[in-house]
Every structure is written in C-alpha cells, then in structure tokens.
A protein has these predicted regions:
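Bacterial signal peptide processing site
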Residues: 46-47
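Metallocofactor- and cofactor-centric catalytic cores in central/energy metabolism, strongly enriched
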Residues: 50-156, 160-176, 210-211, 240-259, ...
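Extended hydrophobic packing segments that form well-structured cores
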Residues: 404-507
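Gly/Ser/Thr-rich loops at beta-strand to alpha-helix junctions
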Residues: 80-82, 125-129, 148-158, 173-181, ...
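C-terminal catalytic subdomain
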Residues: 332-437
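N-terminal export leaders
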Residues: 25-43
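Conserved, well-structured core segments that form the ligand-binding/active-site neighborhood
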Residues: 34, 40, 178-354
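N-terminal secretory signal peptides
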Residues: 1-25
Length: 507
C-alpha cells in the first residue's frame, strides 16, 4: 500500500489540496467548455457527449459498442369493424381515418426512436377472413411481437385471436374502445400486454419491452471469477466464465495511455469534490476501465461482473474497479460487482428496459427512521437516463471504503424522487418493490459503502422485511412497467410482505 493510502484519515469530506492534472481545469478550458455548452443548448444538438470527447486513436475501444443492438421486428395492425360506424364506441363522430393515420405515424416514430422495426399491415382487419389470414402470416413470419391497435370496442375478439398465434402481443386500445370488462379477460394473460390509454409514451415503453427481451438474448455476460473457463446460461443471458487471473494479467499490461489520462481527467473534473483519491489512484482506476474494455473485446462479450473483492483483498491489483464500473453503467453497459450473476442480469434489465443505469447494492435497515439504506461503492451517475443531454447526478470521488483504495463514486440521489428495486433471485423470478429517496448517508459517520441512499419503502411497514440482497435500485416508480415485462415473458414477480410475518406477495 502506498504512503498516500496509509496516511488517509477518517475525517469528513474535503477536496485534496495537491496539484493534479487529472482533476484540474484551467480557466481557458473552463470558458471553452462553457461556450461549447451554450452552443449545444442553443442549437439543440442531439448529444452533449462532444463536450467531453476527443479524437479517439485507432487502439481505443468505444465503450458504447458493447451494448447489444439486435434486430427487433414488430408487426403492427389495426383491428376494427367495417365503417361507417353507427352508434357503439368510439362513436359515429369519431374521426376514424385521421386517428388511424395519426397513431400509425406515432407507432412508427416510437419504433424509430428506440431501434425497433415496425412492419405495418396495409389494411385494417375488418372481417373474420382477414383476421385468419393475418394470424397465419404471424405464425409464418414469427416477428418478435405483434402490436394490435383497436378502433372499435367490438374488436376485442380479434385481439384475442391474434394473441393465440403464439407471439408476444401488445394490444393498444385508445380511450373510447374499451370498458373494464373488455380489458379484464385479456389483460392478465401471459404473453400479452394491454394498453387502454391515449398516452403515446405507453406504446414506446411497450416496444422497449420487446427490445429489452431481445437485448437480454443477445447479451453474453463475462463472469471473471475462479480458475476455470466455462459457459452457462442465466435465463435469457449467455454466460462466459474466465479465470480471475485473466483480468489481473490484463490490468498489469495496460499502460498509462493518453486515454487513461483523459478518462481520469474527465471523471475528476466533473466531480463535486474529491476526497481521498490521488492522481495515481485516478490513473490506476482509468487503467482498470480500459483493461475491462479490452477483456470484453477479447472474449466477445457485452457485459461483465468480476470478483472485485477477491482481487483487492489478495492485493492482485492496486485499485478496485469502482470508477470504471460507474462509467460502464453510464454508457448502458453492465459492469456488476462480486461476480454475482443475478444482480448483473438485474442491472441489464433496468438498462435495457428503461435506458437508465441501476445501482446494485447491499440492503441496510435503518430502524430509527424505518428506511432502507441501499449501499455500495458503484453507482452510475446518469441515473436520469442514458441520453447524454440529461444532467448527471452530482457525485463525490471517494476511495473504495472497505479497502480505502482507488476511486469510488459517491452519487447523491435526488431526495423526494421515486425509485424501483428489482432483483432476479432465480432466472425466471424477481423481487420487485418501490419507494422514495429519503436522503443520502455520508461515510463517515456511517460505515459501509460510499453511495448510501435512504429509501422510504412503499407498502412495507418495516424496513427489515425488504426481500433480497444485491437488489438493483433505479430512478422512477416503474412497478407496473416491470410487471408488464414479466407477464409478457413468463417471469414470476414477488413483492416484499406488507407486514412482518406475512408471506411474500406474488404480483
């Protein structure tokens, strides 16, 4: 351990005072960045990422290239009665053709935004013969999903027939085409998702479900642990195990390159403050990030989880991978802790289904306040979304608390905002709960990991009854969206019990 690390104290957060090229910014650089930011905002550019990038050398690996982008194909069709209408909802006054055109365009636009190909059927289904022919077409072409839009409340039978084709089915019923009785029979069927709404974002989220499932299927998770090389599966995700020494060796041959200097500079310069980490820590953390990218490329994988504590406890590497893992999460590429496969799959779920990073954590009960503290040393900063225009959460650079080595992000989560907790505890089953951010805990005075978020749980009377370990927390109340995904793809959902002694609640 270096003298820098040995001299660290347990005093409260203060910015270190030594000059450090990896975490300082000159006045000229600051003014240039500010001008670029103003230009970006006034011209409405698609991404603010350019503020922090530089020309990449041929040797550098684009982190975003690991995020799977499989082809996703959805067949879309209108189901209705033969017009003109006389009585019956949506009503004779309803502008049938203009609404058909508007929603058709909205569905196409939603698909384009998230990378889903929409194949629109040319004519609406208005009789039994057309329905039967379309069902045969679906069974023959086997798209990833079918989206059925209803334009009459007597067309629910058509939706049911299409759902029997054996392909995941999204039913969109604009308000005015369904009563509760229409929806109830189909809405809770496995493999089906029913939207009764005027909200276009609900259609886009349904298409994200289809895309997320394909992304999980396309993901190969690198598990860096143990001494053997083998393959496996966890639900939809393929697994590639490699010996832990593979990463240790990769780190040892990764130099302090220009990329490493830039990565350290960027992460340090955007921090609210820097407490324990030194310049050397920043460069080693950047080397770990680059080594992880190279290992992923060498193994042909899309995500990884490493035996990070084993490497650090045995002093095989001089830094935990926390800073690099946080950067991975910010680019939509999963980097899980402790070679834990289920939590890594949970991180993928939030990233693929909602385009925002999750926070894998240890659950700590705070019994005086009756809140759960979600605590770990890796959190992404783009918790509002992977879109680079969205502001990242403020963060403080700290050491990894258990070892007092390296660089970890203490991300400050927004108090008062809702959050969702998910964890695959089996390949086909997950825990699902929600809550609200109540505060951020500093270390010290607390012990434990650097990002520690207080969560006041919904529908759980006692924080000690929250189920799971290494749950993944992400911003927003997405309970219904997660339940919809699980219903579509046959995943069992379990909620923590409301009161102590009650059994866990299935969704």
């Amino acid at each position: 351990m270096s003298s820098n690390h040995q001299s660290r104290s347990n005093e409260g957060p203060t910015v270190h005072g030594h000059p450090c090229s990896c975490c300082s910014m000159s006045r000229r650089s600051f003014l240039g960045a500010a001008a670029a930011c103003t230009a970006a905002l006034t011209t409405g550019c698609a991404s603010l990422q350019s503020l922090h990038t530089r020309p990449r050398s041929n040797e550098e690996i684009d982190i975003a290239s690991f995020r799977p982008r499989p082809q996703v194909r959805v067949m879309s069709v209108i189901a209705r009665q033969k017009p003109p209408y006389w009585l019956g909802w949506p009503g004779t006054a309803y502008p049938l053709e203009s609404e058909r055109a508007r929603y058709t365009q909205a569905i196409a636009d939603a698909g384009r935004r998230i990378g889903v190909e929409i194949v629109q059927e040319g004519e609406p289904l208005e009789d039994k013969e057309a329905v039967a022919a379309f069902v045969k077409k679906v069974q023959s072409e086997k798209p990833d999903a079918v989206l059925v839009m209803l334009q009459h409340f007597q067309s629910w039978g058509t939706a049911g027939e299409i759902a029997k084709a054996g392909v995941p089915t999204i039913v969109f019923a604009p308000v005015g085409t369904a009563f509760t009785g229409h929806v109830n029979g189909l809405a809770f069927r496995s493999g089906v998702h029913v939207i009764s709404s005027l909200e276009i974002p609900a259609i886009e989220q349904a298409l994200r479900m289809v895309r997320a499932k394909r992304q999980l299927e396309a993901t190969k998770l690198l598990v860096v642990s143990g001494n053997e090389r083998k393959e496996g599966k966890f639900g939809l995700v393929s697994l590639q195990y490699v010996p832990r020494a593979t990463f240790e060796e990769m780190f040892s041959v990764t130099p302090v390159s220009e990329e490493a200097k830039w990565v350290a500079h960027q992460r340090f310069s955007e921090a609210r403050k820097v407490v324990e980490p030194t310049k050397e820590d920043g460069l080693n953390a950047a080397r770990s990030y680059i080594a992880a990218k190279q290992l992923l490329k060498n193994e042909g994988c899309n995500a990884l989880t490493t035996d990070c504590l084993g490497m650090v406890s045995q002093k095989k590497v001089p830094t935990p991978p926390c800073m690099g893992a946080s950067i991975f999460q910010d680019y939509g590429v999963t980097y899980g802790c402790e070679a834990a496969v289920g939590p890594a799959a949970s991180l993928m779920l939030t990233s693929y289904l909602f385009d925002r990073p999750g926070f894998m954590n240890d659950p700590v009960p705070e019994t005086a306040k009756n809140v759960l503290i979600a605590s770990h040393c890796v959190s992404g900063t783009r918790i509002y979304g992977l879109d680079r225009q969205k502001e990242h959460a403020p963060y403080i650079l700290r050491s990894h608390s258990e070892s007092n080595l390296g660089v970890s992000t203490q991300v400050l989560w927004p108090v008062g905002q809702p959050v969702t907790l998910v964890q695959f505890f089996k390949p086909d089953a997950l825990y699902l709960d929600t809550g609200t951010v109540a505060g951020n805990v500093n270390t010290p005075p607390a012990g434990g990991c650097r990002t520690s978020v207080e969560i006041r749980m919904d529908d759980i009377e006692d924080c000690r009854d929250v189920l799971g370990f290494h749950q993944v927390v992400f911003l927003g109340n997405h309970r219904r969206d997660v339940e919809a995904f699980c219903q579509m793809y046959g995943i069992n959902v379990v909620h923590s019990p409301r009161a102590h002694g009650e059994t866990a609640k299935p969704a």
